[in-house]
Swiss-Prot record:
GO terms for cellular component: membrane. PANTHER family: UDP-3-O-ACYLGLUCOSAMINE N-ACYLTRANSFERASE (PTHR43378), UDP-3-O-ACYLGLUCOSAMINE N-ACYLTRANSFERASE 1, MITOCHONDRIAL-RELATED (PTHR43378:SF2). Pathway: Bacterial outer membrane biogenesis; LPS lipid A biosynthesis. This is UDP-3-O-acylglucosamine N-acyltransferase. The active site is at H240 (proton acceptor). Belongs to the transferase hexapeptide repeat family. LpxD subfamily. It catalyses: a UDP-3-O-[(3R)-3-hydroxyacyl]-alpha-D-glucosamine + a (3R)-hydroxyacyl-[ACP] = a UDP-2-N,3-O-bis[(3R)-3-hydroxyacyl]-alpha-D-glucosamine + holo-[ACP] + H(+).
């Protein structure tokens, strides 16, 4: 059984022990389910009450956290990041993939395959594809002709990469991701929707990770561009000619319409909808289920169906919840000061 002392774990993450440094830790868990011998972490204030109830032997917390519990703590700058390092000690070893080409894989003409590449069963690699050193191409992956794949990229099963795509180094694509499908472009002619040719490409830079069943459409011309370090969740739709700036993060079920650009370090929470041909400034945050229809300045935090500054959205929500009370007060005032004036024909809160 793998075990480490609290002191050893604190040394690994650069933390300070508060409590018993020699306690042996044999596993990891979340704060609600942790048992004796396990270590957990606290980064979200919502779970502070769980500290008093957890059975964990130790907790990784922030340096500023104030505790009245006798439980042993490891104080660090970032509990989540530190706990990620600890997880790696107790996690199973990652699977290794034997280099080579499975006999069921189909390899086209003039394909260039680097060193230590693993191509799994039933993968299809079309003509003139270039694959860098150390890549893993999962089962049933399709890579279209003239695409270029950077070294140490990892494509899980059933990834589709259409022709002429440009994929950087250390890119991770999860199952069902589709890169380079046609953009949604049509022109109405004589009452019919005529397809507009989509002749651009998709460029994905180094260290990008894209979740399961996410789709990135090729440019109408030019390119759809996901820049270095972006992390994109499952079930995201990225339309033609979108540009996503470095180190941006996009949560599930978000949709970005064509020719919109995001600056660097932008955060889009779940189910955000972004209109086309607008720009989201560097460092902006859009909260869940917001709809954005116009440019967003740098570092703005927007929220709501019609995305507004988040403080304004909160004020409007408070006022909205008070409308029934305000309506009753208004009726009483009207009755008091305008006793003979006609009343509204319908009460919007009881009709």
């Amino acid at each position: 059984m793998i075990s480490y002392s609290v002191k050893q774990l604190a040394s690994l993450v650069g933390g300070i022990v508060e409590g018993e440094p020699e306690i042996e830790i044999t596993g990891i868990s979340d704060i609600l389910d942790a048992k004796k011998g396990q270590i957990t972490f606290l980064s979200n204030p919502r779970y502070e009450a769980a500290v008093e109830k957890t059975q964990a032997s130790a907790i990784v917390v922030s340096k500023s956290y104030k505790s009245s519990s006798p439980i042993t703590l490891i104080r660090v700058d970032s509990p989540s990041l530190a706990f990620s390092q600890i997880i790696s000690l107790f996690s199973p070893q990652p699977f290794s993939y034997e280099p080579g080409i499975h006999p069921t894989a189909l390899i086209g003409r003039e394909v260039e395959i680097g060193k230590e590449v693993s191509i799994q069963p039933y993968a299809v690699i079309e003509d003139k594809v270039k694959i860098g050193d150390g890549c893993v191409i999962g089962a049933y992956v399709f890579i279209g002709r003239e695409s270029i794949i950077g070294e140490k990229s990892f494509f899980y099963p059933h990834v589709t990469i259409r022709e002429r795509s440009r994929i950087g180094k250390r890119v991770i694509l999860h199952p069902g991701a589709v890169i380079g499908s046609d953009g949604f472009g049509y022109e109405q002619t004589n009452g019919r929707h005529e397809k507009i040719p989509q002749v651009g490409i998709v460029q994905i830079d180094d260290d990008v990770e894209i979740g399961a069943n996410t789709t990135v459409d090729r440019g109408r011309f030019g390119k759809t561009w996901i820049q270095e370090g972006c992390k994109i969740d499952n079930l995201v739709q990225i339309a033609h000619n979108v540009i996503i700036g470095k180190n941006s993060i996009i949560a599930a079920q978000t949709g970005i319409s064509g020719s919109t650009s995001l600056g660097e370090h932008v955060t889009l929470a779940g189910q955000v909808g972004i209109a086309g041909h607008i720009h989201i400034g560097d460092g902006a945050t859009i909260t869940a289920q917001s709809g954005v229809t116009k440019d967003v300045p740098p570092r703005a935090v927007l929220s709501g169906r019609h995305a507004r500054p988040i403080n304004l959205t909160h004020k409007l929500e408070v006022l909205y919840n008070k409308l029934p009370e305000l309506w009753e007060r208004l009726k009483k005032l009207e009755k008091k000061y305008d006793g003979d004036s006609p009343r509204p024909e319908a009460d919007p809160y009881n009709s």
